[in-house]
């Protein structure tokens, strides 16, 4: 039976002390996916966005998404400022991690490796910088498996000694709200997840 991670999040949020918000390191893939999540979670946490996405190719695309992540943080009204921790681009790390899985279908084994790569760096950074929780915006997407993401996150929480924030942000029309906010703030919405293997193909040729 599938876990209801939205209910788990609801239960966790109900226990948080209102007088002092805990610190959350939130891995984000892009501005659009983080829009609803930041609107939601900044009521309960002091949030730092971690932009760590070595899967995004090419580098120009990585920088473009980073720019719009910064713009969203600058424009979105939140109870208190949202910080941004942007990692240096390291596309080779992703290429090495998924070697041999290049032809896997979208949503398959390659994506599992990618999820773990990004979430493990988030857990590592969370421990290094003394965050109370770590989490990800990825569960807002209807194309991302919340069961898999949360299982990986919970495992890494045990390994790194930092609490995992369970989530399924697509619930309660979270994805719909992210589209509304993206339009409201004029955010760039990409047409593929990030790696070149997931890029749309037209007439046998990958889009430039």
State the predicted function of each range:
Residues 1-208:
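Nucleotide-activated chemistry modules centered on ATP-dependent adenylation/adenylyltransferase
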């Amino acid at each position: 039976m599938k876990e209801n991670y939205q209910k788990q999040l609801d239960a966790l949020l109900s226990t948080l002390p209102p007088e002092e918000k805990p610190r959350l390191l939130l891995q984000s893939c892009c501005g659009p996916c983080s829009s609803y999540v930041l609107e939601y979670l900044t009521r309960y946490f002091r949030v730092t966005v971690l932009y760590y996405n070595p899967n995004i190719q090419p580098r120009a695309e990585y920088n473009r998404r980073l720019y719009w992540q910064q713009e969203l943080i600058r424009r979105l009204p939140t109870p208190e400022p949202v910080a941004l921790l942007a990692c240096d681009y390291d596309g080779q790390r992703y290429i090495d991690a998924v070697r041999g899985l290049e032809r896997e279908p979208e949503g398959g084994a390659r994506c599992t490796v990618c999820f773990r790569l990004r979430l493990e760096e988030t857990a590592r950074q969370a421990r290094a910088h003394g965050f109370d929780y770590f989490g990800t915006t990825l569960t807002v997407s209807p194309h991302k498996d919340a069961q898999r993401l949360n299982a990986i996150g919970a495992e890494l929480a045990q390994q790194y000694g930092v609490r995992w924030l369970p989530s399924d942000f697509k619930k309660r029309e979270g994805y719909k709200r992210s589209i509304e906010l993206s339009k409201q703030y004029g955010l760039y919405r990409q047409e593929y997840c990030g790696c070149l293997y997931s890029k749309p193909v037209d007439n046998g040729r990958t889009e430039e």
